[in-house]
């Protein structure tokens, strides 16, 4: 494992200095699905890329999709991606204890089996305790756009995209050399500093940003009050360099990311009777992420284009429980270190068979590694050492056919054949369709009927298969015989737009069925009082519901979105709601830019209570409403520079927002808090040619 890790990190360091990939800049008309100029590799606001791995109009998508643009991200001003995603319809982010930086679970339409990619590469670590997404370490300043695709995406999206796909794209430079700087502060000991340089022309573009974000947390519990040791700080470094080649018909690009995040864990657990929680002064977690994406994309002819991509994602997750005088065992210490690596080599080739038919063929090679060890020291148990490692290899081939019938009926279908060294061979078909018609006798109005169906699989994480815990109070056993989860899902919906898309109403129904669902089973040994458990394929689950959304954008300076999602989820073994899933969720956000100087937004999120497990007597959190207000005001503007004042207020009404609950304690998110600061941008004047 160490040999593979050293090779991967060395390759990542080399790739950092090599330029990478561009997404095609297309006409947004429904009839044009081909790659076009690689000037900056941008995808337009009304286009989507991740659905077929090439840019196409959102109007043609047979699935339910949302696009969060750089403009939307900047308007919200939220530094953490998980908070931005929580404003999106049918997406729910559950923080494990309510404090920024704590482990988070992202669910879409009730399931946490969602795939997250950054620049096309999987961003979920193999050391997670369940397949899914942990977005708490991703900061938003370096993200250009976020694409949210609901429903099974196992064909083009690949493994672990059964519940949906969230695709993030890194910012790219354009225009003359520019410098951005911002400095912000707020209550709860919050500070945020950022510096970025960017620029680009038809030949070369570049972007590099450094962001440091820190907060004291603000979490509280019902039995301990405000948690004192709850700090979180995160350093992100991002570099994106692209070079056009072959008469601007090709693009070579490298995107590098580094993140170092520390989260203090202020809640400890007593090591002797009476067992319970206490204010821990020195426990913490430390997380490192390295990601590198190197790609080459080429429009060889008007009818054929392709891309080749290599991706590396390496994570080190460390947790430290340090000795103190409160726990009941003054020498008790537990140190856990897990290193995990994933490498991908992928390619997709798109053939324009006819003006109305685009055929895509792709291949993906993926290998994963995990290497973990723990050290547990106790007064009565002595020193207990534990180590584990494992790896898998997977090869995929897939085909996807996109048919356009007279710019009104759009049909997509295909399948992926996957072979995993541990889980065997399986096929995941997907199909979708969209029918777009002018509304009868109503100028500027369109009616869109959409539907999608698919099968997908979720591979167990390497931690679920190989990870072990061997401490004085708990033993978690490896289960190398775990099977992949299987899912089948379908949805239908209708979208009605008016006034040339200025007003849009969307309503849909979704239905999903899982089998071989992975759960955790265990028991307490009556002789030793040690809890013993492991991950097993025990459950089946079903999820169904409906979602509605209204989007109103009467003017470029005003945009409002409101959504409602009802989710009925059930563990068919216990006939109980799935954990962490709110039955009712209401969200709304308004962007208002009355002039060039002022930019304001307001957001609201209301969720019903959530069960913490599938047990009949499971604890349940309370309903909550969270309101946010923010904006940016331009103070000074010159020919080449601007200075702005920005600020945001969170949990405006100081609600007790319960994020997690046990039999003895309830964990609450921070009360009302704010952040404000200055943003400065300067563009280097271009030299004028002498006459």
Residue ranges and their predicted role:
Residues 137-180:
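A beta-strand signature from Gram-negative outer-membrane beta-barrel systems
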Residues 303-323, 367-371, 448-454, 458, ...:
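Membrane-embedded beta-barrel scaffold of Gram-negative outer-membrane proteins
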Residues 57, 82-122:
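Extracytoplasmic beta-strand/coil segments of soluble accessory domains associated
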Residues 404-411, 511-513, 530-614, 688:
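Gram-negative outer-membrane beta-barrel transporters
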Residues 185-214, 224-264, 284-305, 353-359:
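Transmembrane beta-barrel wall of Gram-negative outer-membrane proteins
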Residues 262, 267-273, 376, 421-427, ...:
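Surface-exposed extracellular loop regions of Gram-negative outer-membrane beta-barrel proteins
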Residues 218, 520, 555, 606-611, ...:
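C-terminal beta-signal and adjacent terminal beta-strands/loops
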Residues 105, 122-150:
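Short acidic/polar hinge/loop motifs at secondary-structure boundaries
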